[in-house]
Curated annotation (Swiss-Prot):
Protein name: FMN-dependent NADH:quinone oxidoreductase
Organism: Albidiferax ferrireducens (strain ATCC BAA-621 / DSM 15236 / T118) (Rhodoferax ferrireducens)
Molecular-function GO term, any one: FMN binding
SUPFAM superfamilies: Flavoproteins
The EC number(s) this enzyme carries: 1.6.5.-, 1.7.1.17
InterPro entries according to UniProt: Flavodoxin_fold, Flavoprotein-like_sf, FMN-dep_NADH:Q_OxRdtase_AzoR1, NADH:quinone_OxRdtase_FMN_depd
Gene expressing this chain: azoR
Binding site for FMN: 9, 15-17, 139-142
Amino acid sequence: MKLLHVDSSILGTYSVSRQLSAEIVAEWRKSRPDTTVEYLDLALNAPNHFGADAIAIKGIAQPEPTEAQRAENALSEQLVSQFLASDVIVIGAPFYNFSIPTQLKAWIDRLAQPGRTFTYNEKGPLGLATGKTVIVASTRGGAYSTSEGGQAMEHQESYLKVVFGFFGITDVRIVRAEGLAMGDAPKAAALSAARADMELATA
């Protein structure tokens, strides 16, 4: 079994999402010691934002791609191949400005490739990356899951569920710690709740 461990927080050792994603991987391996782990730190090795050079080879017919276009295409192929070769993907995904870190979005944009992770048929979109499990370490400074107003502002977990569902992945598990910036007691409660989620997510 192959596990891809992805972190995206820019906070380094201060990051709770990094702490939780590492704990998830460790818990997963306790009962599956044969799991091989590959690590991707998007804060240290962020792909370029998806631009014209990245899509040129696949989306625009031209006689000879430029060196920049070849380089961007090679990076996209490397990332999507790594993703498709993984059985389990553990993602540290903090809540930044109501959504996910830009580095994580840039990675997902490289994965969203027609013919690799999705296609279309007469009924609409069809995900091609089936049979995988995604576990998200979701961290938030405030509390957004407990009210309609908060849920309306949340485009982090909801986005990840939609995009991985679009890729054909129906097993998306959330390990959530929210309210981390609301004081010591709420933070302790959030971490306790996250570890309870973790026990279920790694079972």
